[in-house]
Amino acid sequence: MASTGATPMMQQYLSIKEQHRDAILFYRMGDFYEMFFEDAQTAAPVLEIALTSRNKNDTDPIPMCGVPVKAADGYIGRLIENGFKVAVCEQTEDPAAAKGLVRRDVVRIVTPGMIIDNALLEKGTNNYVVCLAHADGVVGFASVDISTGTFRVCESSDLRAVRHELLRIAPREVVIPESGADDAALSPFVSLFPPAIRTTLANREFDYRTACQRLTDQFQTRSLEGFGCRGLKPGIVAAGALLSYVNDTQRQKASHLTGLEVYSIDQYLLMDEVTCRNLELVANLRNNGRQGTLIDVLDACVTAMGSRLLRRWMLYPLLSAEAINRRLDAVAEAKEGLGTRKAVRELLKQVYDIERLTSRAVMGRVTPRDLLALKQTLFALPGLATELKSFDSPFFSFAGEPGPEGLDKLAGLADLLKAAVREDAPVSIADGGVINPDYHPRLAELVTISRDGKSSLARLEATEKEKTGISTLKVRYNKVFGYYIEVPRSQVGAVPAHYVRKQTLVNGERYITDELKVFEEKALGAEEQRVRLEQELFADIVGRVTACSPMLFAVARVAAGIDVLCALAQVADDHDYVRPEMLSGGEIIIEEGRHPVVERMLSGERYVPNSITLNDTDRQLLIITGPNMAGKSTVLRKVALFSVMAQMGSFVPARRAAMGVVDRLFTRVGALDNLASGQSTFMVEMEETANIINNATPKSLVVIDEIGRGTSTYDGLSIAWAVAEALHDLHGRGVKTLFATHYHELTELENTRPRVKNFHIAVKEWNDTIIFLRKLVEGSTNRSYGIQVARLAGIPGPVIARAKKILLDIEQGTYSFEAKSGTAPGTGQSGPVQLSLFTPPEQMLVDRLQKVDISTMTPLEALNCLHELQQKAHAISETDG
């Protein structure tokens, strides 16, 4: 992009572009944003717009493309989705008043995490940017959603927990020091996210003192201790660097970030990304969509704020039984108060997304339509406050925040918006037509002049027609030529001498007159003044909204909570959910429980409920067997989902549920090859299992749906057996575990471990087929019904028949390998071949081991027996060698 011989405008462009080389520059020129050089070549195919060139006749024309200002948000969104940043460069002075080149500057930088425009955001999901820092083995991270004013900070020395938390936040952008990708402490976390959403800042931005100063200046406080930041260091560094990034990209102070929410990872039920994915809490396994997820079932919220808060409650279930019960009390009250709940939900439907509306107002991005939405919201508040008086729970009240005084101020703001903003206000303030004329006397005067001008224009046209005798004469206006008289070519001969030609057209001529010039100056002067005054009044109104932003954010917090609680009550009422009893111990008791998602997805089929009990005495580890498709996975996931639902404050689909608080929730459910990182199914299984064994506590809940399938049968059985024993014996107390398996041998654990119980999913055989009863019953089963399931899946009949023959031979201890001729290879006739895990000498060792009665042996006898077996093993090994 050489600037030699460039025009002043292009020199200005190149100068601005030089400062934003990592972004596509949207350069404002009139009603368009233009892109040039490499930016144009990159953006045109992504945006599916024409790539043209500036100065086409030059030997080296400049590639260019452009998009209309009015449609820019959509184009910016597409670039962001494709991994680009966009620097928006505006004309910062009135072109009509400019002396020479119009002054321009970048007013904001749009990145994946720095989005505030509603059209580019998902209404029910926060849009987080996260910043990472570390010191002395501790990783700190801060997260901001600039669209809602949320600012959170956390730090931990538990690196695995940090990983899980970052993935739970699911940021749209990650900010790191320039050395972060090569930093041994940060690189494992940086690598979790694709390069397209990583942003680097200079290392100097990650200075502790600088961070403290930035944050106290932002929050207008003397220290950060009031936010609970005592002892935090890398967390503060991350927060300070992130604040600098936010203010820099927005080219202003993000004044709606008024405080820090400090939290600890262990404040909430710990669920890693594997568990969240396997349980399909907020995204399904099929296509990462919302359908078929827990949030899809529970989200009956009527506001966007409520949907976001519900998602947060779901991903951050509580650990305090007292706090859980406070939420459950509120849900119970809303469930019982049907009439009030219905009225409250109807009023909440009139409440727009106050968080994002207010954020846009503070950041100067609010539109006239936003103000109308805010007005409607504010007028709904008094009625909402009145209805909420029927409830006793403090969750259902504005008394705490914003309080009576705050509500009064917001009522005044509502009256102001009603008086000021026209109901038919356009999307943009650019051309006026937003402010009610009666709101300001000078505006009313200018509107009258403009209105009278239109009448005068009509009279002038009629007069000219009469004077000239040209009945087809028209007086018109456009932004390029102003006012003009247009005469068809057939009537040009009748044009008076005092008409001055202004433009020649194919079908006629355009003229001006002295009288029309006088009218134009008067009319355009009034119109320009009206638009300018409206813009000034609009800015003043936005300033008043901004002044009320603390109260508006307070209303948003309360309204979101009310919406979530009423939504949970509505779901409970509609689908026969019950309040879970929160126990002080570790028991989990579910009577006739139903999977919340599966029961809603069944069409015309009756859901079969199941009861289950887990405790720390005799039912701590449940071995669950049964055929594929019988419903083992549904039972397992249901119990895990009940823990999530109860601890987030939701009722559960059951006849009765009593739940102890779970501190960590682990799932090992199925597996897919992670080919990108070279991991097989079996390796993924083992890593997930290792995570469970290494991190589960006696207060955790573990759900394992098959283990060991990715290796040989005997290896898999051995591993599954050992893992089950390890979970039973973990920390000397064990951990509550649901263990579904196809290895029926594991049912023997009930005889060797005191807290193991066998269960199976009942199946009924009928006419050589099976009927899934979907019922969990106590006891084991030794059949998998794999062939019957294969038939149901559509495997051809001959294959099924052959499988049944092979199964029968194997069950009888023989299997005949037949050559193509129908005879066994090398024998001339078919013959049995015994399938055995061990060779004969090894079998002798196995037989000897089976006869050993450890319970009757002294320690010395046991050692002697072990020595004997070891000697025999050495002998067998030498013989084989």
UniProtKB/Swiss-Prot annotation:
InterPro entries, sorted: DNA_mismatch_repair_MutS, DNA_mismatch_repair_MutS-lik_N, DNA_mismatch_repair_MutS/MSH, DNA_mismatch_repair_MutS_C, DNA_mismatch_repair_MutS_clamp, DNA_mismatch_repair_MutS_core, DNA_mismatch_repair_MutS_N, DNA_mismatch_repair_MutS_sf
SUPFAM superfamilies: DNA repair protein MutS, domain I (SSF55271), DNA repair protein MutS, domain II (SSF53150), DNA repair protein MutS, domain III (SSF48334), P-loop containing nucleoside triphosphate hydrolases (SSF52540)
PANTHER family listed in its UniProt record: DNA MISMATCH REPAIR PROTEIN MSH1, MITOCHONDRIAL, DNA MISMATCH REPAIR PROTEIN MUTS FAMILY MEMBER
Gene3D superfamilies named in the record: 1.10.1420.10, DNA repair protein MutS, domain I, MutS, connector domain, P-loop containing nucleotide triphosphate hydrolases
Record-level GO BP terms: mismatch repair
Keywords recorded for this protein, A-Z: ATP-binding, DNA damage, DNA repair, DNA-binding, Nucleotide-binding
Superkingdom as given in the UniProt entry: Bacteria
Species lineage: Bacteria, Pseudomonadati, Thermodesulfobacteriota, Desulfobacteria, Desulfobacterales
Signal peptide, first to last residue: none
Family: Belongs to the DNA mismatch repair MutS family.
GO cellular component, as recorded: cytosol
Keyword field contains DNA damage: yes
Organism: Desulfosudis oleivorans (strain DSM 6200 / JCM 39069 / Hxd3)
Summary of the function given for this chain in its UniProt record: This protein is involved in the repair of mismatches in DNA. It is possible that it carries out the mismatch recognition step. This protein has a weak ATPase activity.
Single GO MF descriptor: mismatched DNA binding
Sites where the protein binds ATP: G626, P627, N628, M629, A630, G631, K632, S633
Protein name: DNA mismatch repair protein MutS
